[in-house]
C-alpha cells in the first residue's frame, strides 16, 4: 500500500501534526554532509517526537505481525545516522570474514569487526523517492537535486551504485534481483519474491550500544539456530549500497541462514546473522580460497554486516 493513500486514512493527530503528515525530507532538496565511511549522512536530526513516523506507521500496517529490525530503525532515526563515526570504507570487514558451516557451533570463536553496510542515509518513502530520478543518464540532475558536488567521491559512489543497479537487471536468471529506493518497494519486492505478505525481516544487531561499529575482536559463539525451519527455502537478502539516501540491492537466495548469539572479549554482545552457501555462488571465489576448500565443495559462511537485511516467510 502506498503511504500517501495509507496516511490519508489516518487522523492528523496520529501523524504528529495538526494538518498533513510531515514528509521525511523537505521539498526544497536533501542536504547531506560528506563522511568517509559511506559519504552520506543527514546534516540535521528531525524534530524529536513521541508520535510514530510515517515509515513506522507504514510498517505497522503493512507488516502488523513483524517487528521492525534494527537495520530499518536506524535508517528512520536521523539523529543516530548523523552521529555515526567516520570510518574508511576500505576497513569495512564484517562481510569479509568467511568460515565453514561445520565450524559454526556453541563455543567456537570468530574474530569480527562489526561495521555498517553501504546504506547509512535515511530511508525514503515511495512518494519522495519516486520524485527523484534514479538512472545513470540522469546523474547530473540527481546530483543537483540532492546537493551533492559533481566530481566528489560521493558523486562517484552514486555513479557506481546506479551502474550496478542497472546491471542487475541483466543478472543471473536463477535469482530475482532489484535495487529498491524506498521502504515500500523493499517490502513489496520481498513479498513478491517469497509469494506471501506474511513475511518478516531480520538483521545483525549489536546489543546495548549505539555505536556505528565495534572494534575488531574475538567473539565466542553462544548459540546457533536456523532462521527458517525449512532448509533450502527461498529468502531475500538486501544489501546496503552507498547513495545519498538509503538504497538496497535485493535478491533471492537459497542460502541457509542462522541466528548466532555472540559474546565479545570486551563484553559486547551481538545477535548476528550468518548465511551459508553450499554452491559456488558468484563473486566469492576469494571466500573458498580463504577457508582452503574447493569452490562449492562444502558450505561456506559469512556474517551479514550491520544494516543489511534478510527477509523470510513467517
Swiss-Prot record:
Q: Which cysteines in this chain are paired by disulphide bridges? A: none
Provide the tissue specificity: Expressed in shoot and panicles.
Per the UniProt entry, the signal peptide is 1-16
Q: Which SMART domains does its entry note?
A: BURP (SM01045)
Q: Where is the BURP domain?
A: 98-314
User: Out of the domains of life, which is the source?
Assistant: Eukaryota
> What keywords appear on the UniProt entry?
Signal
Name listed for the protein in its UniProt record: BURP domain-containing protein 8
Task: Supply the source organism for this entry.
Answer: Oryza sativa subsp. japonica
Amino acid at each position: 500500500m502506498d503511504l500517501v493513500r495509507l496516511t490519508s486514512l489516518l487522523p492528523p493527530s496520529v501523524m504528529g501534526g495538526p494538518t498533513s503528515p510531515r514528509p521525511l525530507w523537505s521539498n526544497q532538496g536533501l542536504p547531506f554532509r560528506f563522511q568517509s565511511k559511506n559519504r552520506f549522512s543527514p546534516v540535521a536530526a528531525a524534530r524529536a517526537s513521541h508520535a510514530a513516523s510515517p515509515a513506522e506507521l507504514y510498517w505497522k500496517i503493512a507488516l502488523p505481525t513483524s517487528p521492525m529490525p534494527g537495520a530499518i530503525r536506524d535508517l528512520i532515526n536521523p539523529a543516530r545516522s548523523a552521529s555515526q563515526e567516520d570510518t574508511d570504507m576500505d576497513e569495512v570487514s564484517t562481510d569479509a570474514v568467511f568460515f565453514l558451516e561445520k565450524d559454526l557451533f556453541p563455543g567456537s570463536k570468530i574474530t569480527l569487526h562489526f561495521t555498517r553496510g553501504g546504506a547509512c542515509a535515511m530511508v525514503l518513502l515511495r512518494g519522495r523517492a519516486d520524485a527523484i530520478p534514479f538512472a545513470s543518464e540522469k546523474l547530473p540532475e540527481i546530483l543537483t537535486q540532492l546537493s551533492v558536488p559533481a566530481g566528489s567521491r560521493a558523486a562517484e559512489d552514486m555513479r557506481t551504485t546506479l551502474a550496478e543497479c542497472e546491471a542487475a537487471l541483466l543478472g543471473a536468471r536463477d535469482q530475482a534481483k532489484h535495487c529498491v529506493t524506498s521502504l515500500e518497494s523493499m517490502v513489496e519486492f520481498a513479498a513478491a519474491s517469497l509469494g506471501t505478505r506474511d513475511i518478516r525481516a531480520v538483521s545483525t544487531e549489536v546489543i546495548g550500544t549505539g555505536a556505528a561499529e565495534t572494534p575488531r575482536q574475538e567473539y565466542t559463539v553462544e548459540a546457533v539456530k536456523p532462521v527458517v525451519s525449512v532448509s533450502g527455502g527461498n529468502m531475500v537478502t538486501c544489501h546496503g549500497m552507498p547513495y545519498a539516501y538509503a538504497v538496497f540491492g535485493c535478491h533471492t537466495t537459497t542460502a541457509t541462514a542462522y541466528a548466532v548469539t555472540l559474546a565479545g572479549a570486551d563484553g559486547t554482545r551481538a545477535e548476528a546473522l550468518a548465511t551459508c552457501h553450499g554452491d559456488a555462488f558468484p563473486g566469492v571465489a576469494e571466500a573458498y580460497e580463504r577457508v582452503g576448500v574447493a569452490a562449492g565443495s562444502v558450505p561456506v559462511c559469512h556474517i551479514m554486516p550491520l544494516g543489511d537485511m534478510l527477509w523470510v516467510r513467517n
